């Protein structure tokens, strides 16, 4: 089993691209197959090396590896070879219209209530037409047999049928000699023996053309699966819609596995749950679980999943990362604060709160209560049982209810209104610092 992820390096990878990559990766790894990373850089004007590096960096950060990587630019001579064979077979023909002329034709056909399909006028040029186009460089179209039906059994959409008469002869090569997406893609899929192709539903019509080309070349047709596109604010995801790039999510300190857990489950019948490693996603993967329903993307959903993931991570999985951020903490500290952070970088704030230098927050109404609390603090360093004993003493001596004690005490000890359980927090702050904060208040 061989599948491929084929990004165009014309922009940074967004969540929609990454989802396709992940599903391709999971499909390959769940079947002990191979994943090809093909860089579709035939768009000479817009493709940039910085985007190639960005794509690779993002995939690596998301824990997705690949078995083979190649750029389409390195295979131009191969595309020329196959293109010339199609020319010799009469399957490709030159055309001379400008983009403006083609757009005018399209509008006229729509005005007449006809589908905007190329009229094949280039196949019936008169001598006068040829003189009119003299000096123009041709572009080339594939001649599709109009009496055929192109079909395949899509792994997500089921039976898909295209009547060739409703398909415009696709452009394979531009006037500058560069190739459009579908031709090099088809040649690569054949040459690298790709068996399974997973991509967005916006490629469904391309699939019909590629199957036709594969038939002309006598190639075996791979299996296809077309995923519904992610939508944000009613529009499909694209590189032109900002805020969804993977590098921005990395800068937000979101966990790679939170993103992967989200991408692997949206659009399926399975609940979106945080997974701490890729193995569990591989083991539960099934392409048949995906459906055709539209998918609305919300970054907030990943943020919420990120919180749930952090609450599951053991200390051993975060220790090195914390130390790399300059945070040296104990296992007990991590388990005390992990339920109170949105992203892992917030651990630093709790490390500072548990250290010296916190300024107590207190009003005059609670000053007497805090002084009493300091007098009642049990002797010795706080342990897991200190909080229960201390709270009971404060309640008995002050006559206050628990709810009237918690907030003043938390503000005095941490400077913030919410945080870890006191039973876990007190041993981290230590007796001397607790007394300093209460009496300093």
Curated annotation (Swiss-Prot):
GO terms for molecular function: ATP binding; glutamate-tRNA ligase activity; tRNA binding. One of its GO terms (cellular component) is cytoplasm. ATP binds at residue 239. InterPro entries: aa-tRNA-synth_I_cd-bd, aa-tRNA-synth_I_codon-bd_sub2, aa-tRNA-synth_I_CS, aa_tRNA-synth_I_cd-bd_sf, Glu-tRNA-ligase_bac/mito, Glu/Gln-tRNA-synth, Glu/Gln-tRNA-synth_Ib_cat-dom, GluQ/Sye. A motif ('KMSKS' region) lies at residues 236-240. It is found in: Cytoplasm. Signal peptide: none annotated. The keyword Protein biosynthesis applies. Its EC number is 6.1.1.17. The keyword Cytoplasm applies. GO terms for biological process: glutamyl-tRNA aminoacylation. A motif ('HIGH' region) lies at residues 7-17. It catalyses: tRNA(Glu) + L-glutamate + ATP = L-glutamyl-tRNA(Glu) + AMP + diphosphate. Its main location: cytoplasm. It comes from the Bacteria. Monomer. HAMAP family: Glu_tRNA_synth_type1. Catalyzes the attachment of glutamate to tRNA(Glu) in a two-step reaction: glutamate is first activated by ATP to form Glu-AMP and then transferred to the acceptor end of tRNA(Glu). This is Glutamate--tRNA ligase 1. It comes from Anaplasma marginale (strain St. Maries). The gene is gltX1.
């Amino acid at each position: 089993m061989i599948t491929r992820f084929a990004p165009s390096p014309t922009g940074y990878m967004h969540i929609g691209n990454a989802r396709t990559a992940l599903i391709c990766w999971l499909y390959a790894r769940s079947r002990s197959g191979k994943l090809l990373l093909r860089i579709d850089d035939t768009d000479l004007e817009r493709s940039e090396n910085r985007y190639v590096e960005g794509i690779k960096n993002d995939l690596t950060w998301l824990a997705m590896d690949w078995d083979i990587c190649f750029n389409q630019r390195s295979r131009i001579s191969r595309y020329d070879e196959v293109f010339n064979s199609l020319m010799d077979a009469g399957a490709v023909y030159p055309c001379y219209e400008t983009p403006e002329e083609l757009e005018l034709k399209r509008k006229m056909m729509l005005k007449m209530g006809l589908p905007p399909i190329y009229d094949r006028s280039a196949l019936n040029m008169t001598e006068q037409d040829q003189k009119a186009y003299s000096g123009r460089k041709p572009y080339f179209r594939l001649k599709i047999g109009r009496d055929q039906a192109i079909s395949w059994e899509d792994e997500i959409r089921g039976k898909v049928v295209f009547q060739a008469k409703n398909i415009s002869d696709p452009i394979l090569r531009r006037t500058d000699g560069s190739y459009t997406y579908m031709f090099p893609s088809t040649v690569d899929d054949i040459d690298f023996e790709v068996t399974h192709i997973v991509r967005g539903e916006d490629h469904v019509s391309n699939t019909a053309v590629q199957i036709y080309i594969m038939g002309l070349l006598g190639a075996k047709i791979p299996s296809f699966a077309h995923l519904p596109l992610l939508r944000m604010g009613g529009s499909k995801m694209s590189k032109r819609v900002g805020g969804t790039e993977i590098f921005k999510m990395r800068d937000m300190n979101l966990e790679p596995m939170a993103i992967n857990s989200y991408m692997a489950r949206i659009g399926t019948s399975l609940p979106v749950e945080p997974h701490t490693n890729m193995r569990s996603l591989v083991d539960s993967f099934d392409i048949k679980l995906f459906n055709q329903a539209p998918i609305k993307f919300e970054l907030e959903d990943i943020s919420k999943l990120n919180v749930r993931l952090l609450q599951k991570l053991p200390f051993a999985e975060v220790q090195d990362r914390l130390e790399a951020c300059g945070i040296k903490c104990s296992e007990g500290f991590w388990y005390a604060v992990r339920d109170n952070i949105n992203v892992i970088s917030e651990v630093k704030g709790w490390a500072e709160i548990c250290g010296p230098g916190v300024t107590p927050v207190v009003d005059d109404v609670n000053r007497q209560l805090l002084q009493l609390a300091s007098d009642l603090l049990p002797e010795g360093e706080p342990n897991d049982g200190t909080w229960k004993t201390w709270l009971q003493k404060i309640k008995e001596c002050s006559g206050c209810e628990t709810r009237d004690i918690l907030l003043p005490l938390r503000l005095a000890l941490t400077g913030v209104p919410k945080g870890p359980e006191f039973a876990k927090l007190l041993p981290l702050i230590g007796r001397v610092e607790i007394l300093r904060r209460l009496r300093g208040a």
